[in-house]
Amino acid sequence: YTWAESDSQYIDSFTNDQAANIDLTLKHYDSNASTENQPTSDNVYLDGLKYHTPDYSKSNGTSVIDFPMHWNFSNASNAFTRACQEDPYYNDASWNVTYVDSHDYGPDMNSRYDGGTQAWAENLDVLFTFRGIPCLYYGSELEFQKGVPMDVGPNAPLSTTGRAYFGDYLEGDVTATDFGTYTNASGAVASTLEAPLAVHIQQLNRIRRAVPALQKGQYTRSNTYVDGNMAFV
């Protein structure tokens, strides 16, 4: 998804013929359905323990939401492992937007995340300290609507789903001064900001802002330097 097209038959090949465009799209999908013969990159990896300048000469200039990683957030270890497996196939996975849940998936197909506060905290640790750009879905800092159906279309009020209105939790006043730093909170938003996961996110934000390598860095899992299931530098 992040590579410049290298096959001339797919470059600037769309026409006003809708059927032909669909056929071309399906052909392109089928021809790239596996990682075999696909380009790989070391842009996201350290050279030993040293940063190296990424080579973007074959990049198409876009990045993606990291759906494979998201889909494996049944626990932090699974998500981390899946991300490491996929990273060579992105031009630079440090640009991937990483997330646990969304308006569609929690990350399962049925309900908002209900793995517990401790598991949520570990998931957030991965999002804010591993490669990628962390993204939070509204309400997750409170485990909002945990366990309820994500979306059932017209078959139930939104208030009973994962897409329920969250604004009530944000009523009041607060003055934000920096990432994870605020003063003068009052009303419902004060309680929201004091929730365990909200406090954890504030702390992770401050750590990430203080360490440039966590914001946009490279990593290594070489056993020369680290040892452990989720260990990296």
Show where each model-derived region lies.
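Active-site neighborhood of divalent metal-dependent phosphoester/pyrophosphate hydrolases
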Residues: 100-107
